[in-house]
Amino acid sequence: MTYLAVVLNGPKAKNGRKVFDSFLEQNRQMFWNRELTSACESITYMGFMRPGTLFVSGPASQLTVLKDAWARRILKPAMGYTITSLGDLGAIQQVEQMHFVPLGDVICDAVAQLNRQGLAATEQAIRQYVARHCPHVAPPGIEMVRQTITSLLSTGFVYKMADHYFVSVPTNSPMRPPAKAATKTTKTTVECQTGASMMCPQQTSTSSDEHVIEPAKKDHKKCQNSNRRSIFARLFSRGMKPQTIMPSASPIHVGGPPTPPPAAMLPTKNKYPTYHHDLNEECQRKARRRNHPRRGETQKLLSSSSECLKYYPVDMPETRPTRRRARMASPLRSSTPNNSDSAYSISPPHTDSNEEAGSISDSEINHTYININKFRRQNFDSTQFEDLTGATATTSEEPEILGRHIRGVLISNL
């Protein structure tokens, strides 16, 4: 077994094993180069010498693959490092690198890196990536990149979707995440719900001394029995009470003709309904009250302007003070009740039609009234009073009647 020394340039590493694992991980990503990936699986870690010399060993054929990859400038260093030299450990002879670089491997690596970063892997993007991240490779032209991609498409290493290119990842590639093992579906039983399997697991034994129980096992069994009496076991072990189905009040008969319900179950209908005499007026009054809003209530519309808003304190009083509307008193009028022989007047009589309503008459003038219809031979239901102060006789009978039966009522202005 021969040894190979890889001289790395980068930050000072304290653990050479991590540097070796990073070196293998970077080269395993080139899964399209099967010889290099198989060589990474075969080599072993031998040691590390500071500041950055890595020693590996393996079969001679696999180490030769690493030398060829370094010679063709496709061998990748560990993350954060660069490979300055590579050679055998015996004489540490340096391997000369060729000027020819396989463009297929470089383009495959560029497409894989663009896919991993979530960038569009177009022809122009691939060319820019090679020119920026591969200084040892002369920037290829767009036609050379297109020809190389066409050859990769024919071999199946790269596939195209619209104008974007993607690397065909095999199933055993380290870039593909490992598939999760299918979880076995468990069947929910009564023991899972009641917790009996957790409290008292069943123990099966095939040994011949099955009935022999040691003292330690007895203590373990007592502990299990005490756990079974815990509150969770008592809660879950309660059985469900059987639900009693109440018989229906009206049993359903299937197959028979539908029978009409008995007359006693039907509600009685009043053929001659009666209502109170003022029902119509009451309904109209309620409808009028519903349609016409109350006096003083105005419909307030919302406005988007802040000038029209009125802000009240947070603690509003239960009832806001309201002012009653001042009403003007209606003028009094004189009237005489029916079936009355006496004169009745709330306000003084008005003889002059030019006077205004509600004006006060002279308090010095006294008026005398007498019922004329009482002394006439005609039968009247109402009374008629005349003022004797300024009355003139219109008939021949009235002066005699007034002279003999003058029974007046003197009413003075109050």
Curated annotation (Swiss-Prot):
Predominant location: cytoplasm
Superkingdom of origin organism: Eukaryota
UniProt entry tagged with the keyword Ion transport: no
Span of domain Winged helix Storkhead-box1: 93-170
Compositional bias (Polar residues): 332-351
Region Essential for association with cell cortex, annotated ranges: 1-31
Alphabetized GO MF terms: DNA-binding transcription activator activity, RNA polymerase II-specific
Gene Ontology CC annotations of this record: cell cortex; cytoplasm; nucleus
InterPro entries assigned: Storkhead-box_winged-helix, STOX1/2
Residue ranges of the TM segments: none
Region (Nuclear localization signal): 321-327
Annotated segments matching region Disordered: 282-362
Keywords noted in UniProt: Cytoplasm, Nucleus
Location(s) in or outside the cell: Cytoplasm, Cell cortex; Nucleus; Cytoplasm
A matching Pfam family: Stork_head
Segments of this protein annotated with the region Bi-partite nuclear localization signal: 285-295
Function: Probable transcription factor. Required for asymmetric cell division in neuroblasts, perhaps acting by regulating spindle positioning and myosin polarization, and thus the position of the cleavage plane. Required to produce daughter cell size asymmetry in neuroblasts undergoing asymmetric cell division, usually giving rise to one precursor cell and one apoptotic cell. Positively modulates expression of the serine/threonine kinase pig-1/MELK during asymmetric division of the Q.a neuroblast.
Name the UniProt record assigns to this protein: Stork-head box protein ham-1
Lineage: Eukaryota, Metazoa, Ecdysozoa, Nematoda, Chromadorea
